[in-house]
């Protein structure tokens, strides 16, 4: 299925372009073990992947939320380079899209310092003309604000853009902003979860995106 109207492609970062799942899970378990010893296991924290840290920790204890976020981020920063990898066909796909003249951006719920660490580690930062992080917005995904900000910075309209992500927050943010949407089947929560939110496309691997936008 080809759609040649797309000129701009926005990507989520964690779980979409780079595999930070083990880092995120380890960071949650480290933090929660400190505040709630023996209460949370690996399977319990999967639901926390996607929402902002504030949303997750404030729902547990509003008074300790900022302290929990600080502990999470410190551990996440320290362990970043040893636990983060790049997904299959990501680099090659971004390279092909860039050479074909597409405008590329990142829309993430992470802070800029850890975003930059991931881009540097994997070498994919060169492909993106804008990177919208949690630092840049008032409302995180699924609110359309970060998607609309990225499009504004790129000089693109929602109708010519596609938002790619591994979480329902990404799909809903794209829909709320008026873009097309693509889910990734390698989401840790399973493609069935993502399919419930009816993305326009589902990618089995990142290179599937090339056919969708008409790159040979």
Curated annotation (Swiss-Prot):
Keyword Nuclease: no
Record keywords, A-Z: Hydrolase, Magnesium
Highest taxon above the source species: Bacteria
GO cellular component: cytosol
Coiled-coil region(s): none
Active-site residue list: 12 (nucleophile)
Matches recorded under InterPro entries: HAD-like_hydrolase_sf, HAD-like_sf, HAD-SF_hydro_IA, HAD_2, HAD_sf, PGP-like_dom2, Pyrophosphatase_Ppax
Stated role: Hydrolyzes pyrophosphate formed during P-Ser-HPr dephosphorylation by HPrK/P. Might play a role in controlling the intracellular pyrophosphate pool.
Name used for this protein in its record: Pyrophosphatase PpaX
């Amino acid at each position: 299925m080809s759609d040649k109207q797309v000129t701009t492609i926005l990507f989520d970062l964690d779980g979409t372009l780079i595999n930070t799942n083990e880092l995120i899970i380890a960071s949650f378990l480290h933090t929660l073990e400190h505040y709630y010893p023996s209460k949370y296991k690996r399977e319990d924290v999967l639901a926390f992947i996607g929402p902002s840290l504030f949303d997750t920790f404030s729902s547990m204890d509003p008074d300790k939320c900022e302290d929990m976020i600080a502990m999470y981020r410190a551990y996440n920063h320290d362990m970043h380079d040893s636990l983060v990898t790049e997904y299959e066909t990501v680099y090659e796909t971004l390279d092909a899209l860039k050479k074909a003249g597409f405008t590329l951006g990142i829309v993430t719920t992470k802070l800029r310092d850890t975003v930059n660490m991931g881009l540097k580690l994997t070498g994919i930062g060169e492909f993106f003309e804008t990177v919208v992080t949690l630092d840049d917005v008032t409302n995180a995904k699924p609110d359309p604000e970060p998607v609309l900000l990225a499009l504004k910075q790129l000089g693109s309209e929602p109708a010519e853009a596609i938002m790619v992500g591994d979480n329902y927050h990404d799909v809903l943010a794209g829909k709320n902003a008026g873009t097309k949407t693509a889910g990734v089947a390698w989401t840790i929560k399973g493609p069935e979860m993502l399919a419930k939110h009816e993305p326009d496309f589902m990618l089995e691997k990142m290179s599937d995106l090339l056919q969708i936008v008409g790159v040979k």
